[in-house]
Amino acid sequence: MELEVRRVRQAFLSGRSRPLRFRLQQLEALRRMVQEREKDILTAIAADLCKSEFNVYSQEVITVLGEIDFMLENLPEWVTAKPVKKNVLTMLDEAYIQPQPLGVVLIIGAWNYPFVLTIQPLIGAIAAGNAVIIKPSELSENTAKILAKLLPQYLDQDLYIVINGGVEETTELLKQRFDHIFYTGNTAVGKIVMEAAAKHLTPVTLELGGKSPCYIDKDCDLDIVCRRITWGKYMNCGQTCIAPDYILCEASLQNQIVWKIKETVKEFYGENIKESPDYERIINLRHFKRILSLLEGQKIAFGGETDEATRYIAPTVLTDVDPKTKVMQEEIFGPILPIVPVKNVDEAINFINEREKPLALYVFSHNHKLIKRMIDETSSGGVTGNDVIMHFTLNSFPFGGVGSSGMGAYHGKHSFDTFSHQRPCLLKSLKREGANKLRYPPNSQSKVDWGKFFLLKRFNKEKLGLLLLTFLGIVAAVLVKAEYY
């Protein structure tokens, strides 16, 4: 591992990842890979998650292509140095912010969307001019293998490498020094990544998860609400970090919600859900058994059917769920949807705030003020009102968590910023040295007073014009005098 990281760092230090033209070429090559090897990519992901190729394309591939196009369109502007506002003492100097690549980045991908959650941060790292080591999840082994095969065929083989393996390989990687680590996965491993990064003072982006609540107000269209929740919850068999984890609603709505979700499930997946090409499977037996354990002692309103041999768990809804039970103590990450009755929106807000900050919050209501209130009085990584998941699709939004649901953000410009150092640059002249006497010893009260005048914004707007004229006269006199020094 050490030799691999050293090799990538030497490639970065050569400087060839920095020019804008090179970055654009690599992004175009990545897009070409996705387009030319689409069939191979679709087949690998489908094998890992029992996904239809249509779902793979719509949930992963199209997002990657859209992100690449967005980067190609905007990158020339983003890499340009940006001038900043100056104060009186620097008004004749050149001041700007220059984005610079961080260096060698480690990206640790996730298994639930193994292509997009690995490639999307890679796009940002390439756009920012970094070298990258990619560590796909070993749980989605087919996707990991296809990435290791294809990426070297299209990208610079010294700057961007794939390292496959399990816990042992990841542990060894984390012992190495990186300039940024980007991890997508669960909170427990996120803490391990952060601890390892701290030894080298390496900054991290942690895309984690949590229990994303979904509040349903009585003032809403339940038919539409339940269709949207059903889509977001059971997509990818519930293995989505921003899936609605549980529902909060008044008790009077509970039976209607159950019935409408049940009917929607039938509409989406047919009478025999197990045979539907649009319904996926749990990634492995360990996660299958973990999810089953969450059903113990619960009231199953519908669903609950399982098949260990194929890792099938039917779309399931639980009612009258006790907040103290196991299913409400950990992220479900599966096709189980608990309903927790609350008296009103006040109790819902308190319920959310008493728990760890989630990755997403969903609120359904015709009452716009109620939605705004829940946004104002809670905290989460992101919010979608009257829908679920959809804020992820807007690449002008930063996507990321807060608190235990993660730190840092990416997508679009936010990815570029995550993998860049915003370097402040001030270029002064060696002339006009007389004007600098104000800051040189020996110090005096008059210098302090002049410093206040130049640097502190204490002007009354009504007197601003007169003060500005006076100030310009003083500056002109100082500059004229300085020319004789």
From Swiss-Prot:
One GO biological process this protein is involved in is:
fatty acid metabolic process
Provide the effect of T184R: In SLS; severe loss of activity
Quote the EC number: 1.2.1.3, 1.2.1.94
Keyword annotations: Disease variant, Endoplasmic reticulum, Fatty acid metabolism, Ichthyosis, Intellectual disability, Lipid metabolism, Membrane, Microsome, NAD, Oxidoreductase, Phosphoprotein, Transmembrane, Transmembrane helix
**Which GO-annotated molecular functions does the record name?**
3-chloroallyl aldehyde dehydrogenase activity; aldehyde dehydrogenase (NAD+) activity; long-chain fatty aldehyde dehydrogenase (NAD+) activity; long-chain-alcohol oxidase activity; medium-chain fatty aldehyde dehydrogenase (NAD+) activity; protein homodimerization activity
The record lists the effect of S415N as:
In SLS; severe loss of activity
Taxonomic superkingdom? Eukaryota
Q: What is the effect of changing P315S?
A: In SLS; common mutation in Europeans; severe loss of enzymatic activity
The reported result of mutating P121L is:
In SLS; severe loss of activity
Q: How does activity depend on pH?
A: Optimum pH is 9.8.
Active site per database record: E207, C241
Q: List the expressing tissues.
A: Detected in liver (at protein level).
Q: Which residues lie on this side of the membrane: Cytoplasmic?
A: 1-463
Give the Phosphoserine positions (modified residues): S293
PROSITE patterns associated with the record: ALDEHYDE_DEHYDR_CYS (PS00070), ALDEHYDE_DEHYDR_GLU (PS00687)
Q: Which Gene Ontology CC terms are recorded?
A: cytoplasm; cytosol; endoplasmic reticulum membrane; intracellular membrane-bounded organelle; peroxisomal membrane; peroxisome
User: What's the catalysed reaction?
Assistant: an aldehyde + NAD(+) + H2O = a carboxylate + NADH + 2 H(+); a fatty aldehyde + NAD(+) + H2O = a fatty acid + NADH + 2 H(+); (2E)-hexadecenal + NAD(+) + H2O = (E)-hexadec-2-enoate + NADH + 2 H(+); hexadecanoate + NADH + 2 H(+) = hexadecanal + NAD(+) + H2O
Query: Where, by residue number, does NAD(+) bind?
Result: G185, N186, T187, A188, V189, G190
Q: Where in the cell is it found?
A: Microsome membrane; Endoplasmic reticulum membrane
Transmembrane annotation, as ranges: 464-484
Task: Name the top EC class.
Answer: oxidoreductase
State the family named in the UniProt similarity comment for this chain.
Belongs to the aldehyde dehydrogenase family.
What is known about its subunit structure? Homodimer.
Noted disease association is:
Sjoegren-Larsson syndrome: An autosomal recessive neurocutaneous disorder characterized by a combination of severe intellectual disability, spastic di- or tetraplegia and congenital ichthyosis. Ichthyosis is usually evident at birth with varying degrees of erythema and scaling, neurologic symptoms appear in the first or second year of life. Most patients have an IQ of less than 60. Additional clinical features include glistening white spots on the retina, seizures, short stature and speech defects.
Mind telling me what this protein is named?
Aldehyde dehydrogenase family 3 member A2
Specify the species: Homo sapiens (Human)
